[in-house]
């Protein structure tokens, strides 16, 4: 099965780091594009942006009622000019199903059934491209320079000064940047990762899984 598109943006970055230094804890905040909710998601965002363009966009700076948005369907509140931190089904302990997928699939893909994972998944007014702010803790000390050097050689990964979803739309690689030591934990790193959720998160990953299965079949 094709894993969740947010998880798949993170794995090409986390896997080589784990192989080298041993991942023990993972904290992630995700910033997920409208296209993650399908065509209906991008259409709803487009309609909301059009309504704002026809109204008083600048008025939103001090009055939420300055624009009359169409009634939201995919999300509980308008996504345009906004962020939505609760747009999935709530599960155990207040985590959404998307946040639990991030935990469970990270454990499965990395082969770490007891990996400590905590995530917050947020929908943002971006058409395509999921982003993650990642705090990762490792068994062994690692510097930002060592991590960047490792990631620069990792397949499917590019190291950028400013990873952003607009520039990564339509590209197969995932982009990582803002790599630095985490001052709040031992042996920790902070990274920002971006991937096209319609390619690496979905179509491209499905092709790569099929190719791997064909190779296994001989």
Where do the language-model regions lie?
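Adenosine-phosphate binding glycine-rich loop
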Residues: 1-40, 190-218
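C-terminal active-site/capping subdomain that shapes the small-molecule cofactor and substrate pocket
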Residues: 113-218
């Amino acid at each position: 099965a094709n894993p969740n598109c947010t998880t798949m943006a993170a794995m090409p970055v986390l896997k080589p780091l784990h192989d080298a230094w041993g991942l023990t804890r993972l904290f992630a905040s995700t910033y997920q594009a409208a296209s993650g909710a399908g065509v209906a998601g991008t259409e709803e965002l487009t309609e909301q942006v059009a309504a704002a363009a026809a109204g008083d966009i600048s008025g939103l700076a001090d009055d939420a009622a300055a624009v009359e948005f169409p009634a939201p369907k995919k999300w509980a509140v308008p996504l345009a000019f906004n962020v939505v931190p609760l747009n999935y089904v709530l599960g155990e302990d207040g985590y959404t199903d998307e946040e639990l997928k991030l935990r469970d699939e990270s454990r499965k893909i990395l082969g770490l059934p007891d990996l400590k994972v905590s995530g917050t998944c947020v929908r943002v007014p971006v058409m395509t491209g999921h982003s993650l702010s990642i705090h990762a803790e490792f068994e062994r000390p690692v510097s930002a320079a060592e991590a960047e050097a490792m990631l620069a050689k990792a397949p499917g990964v590019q190291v950028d000064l400013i990873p952003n979803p607009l520039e990564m739309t339509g590209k197969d690689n995932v982009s990582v940047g803002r790599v630095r030591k985490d001052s709040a934990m031992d042996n920790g790193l902070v990274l920002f990762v971006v991937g096209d959720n319609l390619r690496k998160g979905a179509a491209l990953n499905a092709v790569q899984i099929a190719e791997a299965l064909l190779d296994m079949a001989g």
